[in-house]
């Protein structure tokens, strides 16, 4: 699939790839059995707003190869600014699972980073049992800065073509940037708390809520402490209605 055939939409200065759906995204990342190299970063309204005042995060987003619309507010923003856009929300957790399933079919070597030791072990076991994923190495999130360079070398030596990092943002993006200097020939994806969801330690919103674009509300009801974060998003709503996206 030609790179030029995938439209990009600018939202607050960030170029977001306009994939129509999950299958469209996966077919782009995989050319036959070969997977592209680069970095995947999920974009939502909160990340866009944070990048406005966090120069480091803004630079990380600029350096990423593939920014994709993870938040429903970003999708709606794209559709408002570009009325003919055919773009769908692609939740990071769903993309990761789809990517792992495809990796299992293609035999793509995968390296997992992050999470608690127990959760990581359960993630490995489930991936192997469910999709026969070729996991060539793993490292839980409890490593020191002094261990990082050795970990990069382990990832390189493993021959991994997909590296997923569950450390939260922006730690996982910083990890990706540094690891790519050592092992550029892989697709990197920051996945936040996806391992916890995959193994059942954290409950995700029911499908009906997801389909209605209300996963954010489900999380808010489950974690009322998130209310301050949600209020900050009113700034994005202002951009939306004032056509300043």
From Swiss-Prot:
List, in alphabetical order, the Gene Ontology terms for molecular function in this entry: lipopolysaccharide N-acetylmannosaminouronosyltransferase activity
Q: Which CDD domains match?
A: Glyco_transf_WecG_TagA
Q: Which reaction does it catalyse?
A: UDP-N-acetyl-alpha-D-mannosaminouronate + N-acetyl-alpha-D-glucosaminyl-di-trans,octa-cis-undecaprenyl diphosphate = beta-D-ManNAcA-(1->4)-alpha-D-GlcNAc-di-trans,octa-cis-undecaprenyl diphosphate + UDP + H(+)
Looking up Pfam families in the UniProt record yields: Glyco_tran_WecG
Q: What is its EC number?
A: 2.4.1.180
| Pathway(s) it belongs to | Bacterial outer membrane biogenesis; enterobacterial common antigen biosynthesis
UniProt xrefs under SUPFAM superfamilies: Periplasmic binding protein-like I (SSF53822)
Keyword list (alphabetical) reads: Glycosyltransferase, Transferase
The record ties this protein, via InterPro entries, to: Peripla_BP_I, UDP-ManNAcA_Trfase_WecG, WecG_TagA_CpsF
What does the record list as GO biological process?
Answer: enterobacterial common antigen biosynthetic process
Asked whether the UniProt record includes Transferase among its keywords, one would answer: yes
Q: Does the keyword Transferase apply?
A: yes
Q: What family does the database annotate?
A: Belongs to the glycosyltransferase 26 family.
The free-text function statement in the UniProt record for this protein reads: Catalyzes the synthesis of Und-PP-GlcNAc-ManNAcA (Lipid II), the second lipid-linked intermediate involved in enterobacterial common antigen (ECA) synthesis.
Please identify the protein, giving its name as recorded: UDP-N-acetyl-D-mannosaminuronic acid transferase
Give the source species: Proteus mirabilis (strain HI4320)
Gene it is expressed from: wecG
